[in-house]
Amino acid sequence: MAVGKNKRVSKGKKGAKKKVIDPFSRKEWYNLKAPVTFNVRNFGQTLVTKTVGTKLATDGLKGRVFEMSLADLNADEDQAYRKIKLSCEDVQGRNCLTDFHGTSVTRDKLCSLIRKNYSLIEAFADVKTLDGYNLRLFCVGYTKRRPGQLKSTCYVRTSKVRLIHKKMVSVMTNEASNSTLKELVKKVIPESIGKEIEKACKSIFPLQNVLVRKIKVLKKPKFDLTKLMESHNYSGDEEGRTLKVKESENATNLLTAELQSS
């Protein structure tokens, strides 16, 4: 027996329960703000670990990408087939200011457009907007039967597919290079670019259901807080204006009435 060792002293059990700490007690909620391009500005909340020492909570928020349905951002169920990606660029108080980071069409929508005996035509183009965003636009379209066509199939020749590819790329390049990112998003949401492609390709072969199925942000310009605040409508021009309320003819000044009565 070793000197100083007492067998009678009870030891702690190995399987003792540890103190349970709620993981959410170390986290806090931040509000997500969408740009003014969308109707719904507050589109959700996100969790982040609280600031501890030199590790700031804002560092864990910047760069986060959130994917939302366009139906929720615009309060329109008809736009549920399109998804929007928004990335957190800056944090103001408890609000995360986001910016456009891409868009895509749901698989259900693409599968619903595919038809038997019709040709599917795809194209993509790398473009640069006026405000310095490098984007890659993906377009998809389907052939359409000519008026009075008797043939059951509606396939297009490879030579015409090449011409349609060129038209798709040229239209997407012109629309994107002559507009800012905000203006481009406004064009993509109502599918105006797809309608322009249908008009341009009408002389080659009639198309239908042409849409920009995906936009990928390849490179963003240098971060500018002023432009971000403008996209969230924080400019000084939007301050409240004074309202002139016309006073009723029957209204009287109480002090004047008391002086007249005395």
UniProtKB/Swiss-Prot annotation:
The keyword NADP does not apply. InterPro entries: Ribosomal_eS1, Ribosomal_eS1_CS, Ribosomal_eS1_euk. Pfam families: Ribosomal_S3Ae. One of its GO terms (molecular function) is structural constituent of ribosome. Keywords: Cytoplasm, Ribonucleoprotein, Ribosomal protein. GO terms for cellular component: cytosolic small ribosomal subunit. The keyword Ribonucleoprotein applies. It is found in: Cytoplasm. Its main location: cytoplasm. GO terms for biological process: translation. Belongs to the eukaryotic ribosomal protein eS1 family. Component of the small ribosomal subunit. Mature ribosomes consist of a small (40S) and a large (60S) subunit. The 40S subunit contains about 33 different proteins and 1 molecule of RNA (18S). The 60S subunit contains about 49 different proteins and 3 molecules of RNA (25S, 5.8S and 5S). HAMAP family: Ribosomal_eS1_euk (MF_03122). This is Small ribosomal subunit protein eS1. The lineage of its organism: Eukaryota, Sar, Alveolata, Apicomplexa, Aconoidasida.
